From Swiss-Prot:
Belongs to the ABC transporter superfamily. Lipooligosaccharide exporter (TC 3.A.1.102) family. It is an enzyme of class 7 (translocase). This is Nod factor export ATP-binding protein I. Keywords: ATP-binding, Cell inner membrane, Cell membrane, Membrane, Nodulation, Nucleotide-binding, Plasmid, Translocase, Transport. PANTHER family: ABC TRANSPORTER ATP-BINDING PROTEIN, ABC TRANSPORTER ATP-BINDING PROTEIN NATA. Part of the ABC transporter complex NodIJ involved in the export of the nodulation factors (Nod factors), the bacterial signal molecules that induce symbiosis and subsequent nodulation induction. Nod factors are LCO (lipo-chitin oligosaccharide), a modified beta-1,4-linked N-acetylglucosamine oligosaccharide. This subunit is responsible for energy coupling to the transport system. It comes from Rhizobium johnstonii (strain DSM 114642 / LMG 32736 / 3841) (Rhizobium leguminosarum bv. viciae).
């Protein structure tokens, strides 16, 4: 695919003091963040955290109750048409025409942007190559695998060469192979200068793709930063997951060697700079299963909210 045409504003999206209420209930609460052109910025949080409402406001589909939103230099929602022409959208659900072929889906979608058939036909080969669907151009969408449909949805969003891509849970429901292929395609777009706003509840996805992210809970921002910086700041040591015993009893035993302990269900999470010492303390408990691993964004979310991310 061609590189993005035209110069980009150094700021792709800016939210300043944005709140949104429905029927007296606050669903987004005093939210501010800035997304630089060319970066991948993640909105990370469980269902109900406000991610969908935030993207709807960015797209001008609903107005903030309080605050200001600027997208690609256009203030939403008043100048929404100026911005929408430069935005590609990949929703959580494919919304493809199942009875049309892959090529026909691209042709129909291009016309929404008032592209001529000739213009669309010119870009279709590069879009098929990008999506690795060259051999499926004349295949009905109904006959594609789930991963192929997601790649087609992504390719379709690129038909007007947008400056900004908004991706809503782009790999939910995909198997690991299909998920990794989508991630590889998204990294190639970032290498070409596209800006991506990614909403996800998949921690690994956010950690692999995002330059920066905003962690949300109940419409509030509870953390913002680079994934690995957040992990180091909030956790900063190895993690041992302990299964099979009484978490309360085990906590008392290993607390002297733990930087922090968290209990989630029947699992005890031990954050410790000295994993070997903790293992030694637990050797007498033959029924335990221990998993030692590096810290990740799931730990950050648990640390900040006291609960695991809802799947």
């Amino acid at each position: 695919m061609d590189s993005p045409s035209g110069s980009l504003s150094p700021v792709a999206i800016d939210l300043a003091g944005v709140s949104k209420s429905y029927g007296g209930k606050i669903v987004v609460n005093d939210l501010s963040f800035t997304i630089a052109a060319g970066e991948c910025f993640g909105l990370l949080g469980p269902n109900g955290a406000g991610k969908s409402t935030i993207t709807r406001m960015i797209l001008g589909m609903t107005s903030p109750s309080v605050g200001k939103i600027t997208v690609l230099g256009a203030q939403e929602p008043g100048q929404v048409r100026l911005a929408r022409a430069k935005i590609g959208i990949v929703s959580q659900f494919d919304n493809l025409d199942l009875e049309f072929t892959v090529r026909e889906n691209l042709l129909v979608y291009g016309r929404y942007f008032r592209m001529s058939t000739r213009e669309i036909e010119t870009v279709i080969p590069s879009l098929l190559e990008f999506a690795r669907l060259e051999s499926k151009a004349n295949t009905r969408v109904a006959d594609l695998s789930g991963g192929m449909k997601r790649r087609l949805t992504l390719a379709r969003a690129l038909i007007n060469d947008p400056q900004l891509l908004i991706l809503d849970e782009p790999t939910t429901g995909l198997d690991p192979h299909a998920r990794h292929l989508i991630w590889e395609r998204l990294r190639s777009l970032l290498a070409r200068g596209k800006t991506i706003l990614l909403t996800t509840h998949i921690m690994e996805e956010a950690e692999r793709l995002c330059d920066r992210l905003c962690v949300l809970e109940a419409g509030r921002k509870i953390a913002e930063g680079r994934p690995h910086a957040l992990i180091e700041e909030q956790i900063g040591c190895p993690v041992i997951e302990i299964y099979g015993g009484d978490p309360q009893e085990l906590s008392l035993l290993i607390r002297p060697n733990a930087r922090r302990l968290e209990i989630s269900g029947e699992t005890l999470f031990c954050y410790t700079p000295d994993p070997e010492q903790v293992r030694a303390q637990l050797r007498a408990y033959s029924n335990l299963r221990l998993l030692e691993r590096p810290p990740n964004l799931e730990d950050v979310f648990l640390r900040l909210t006291g609960r695991e991310m809802e799947k």
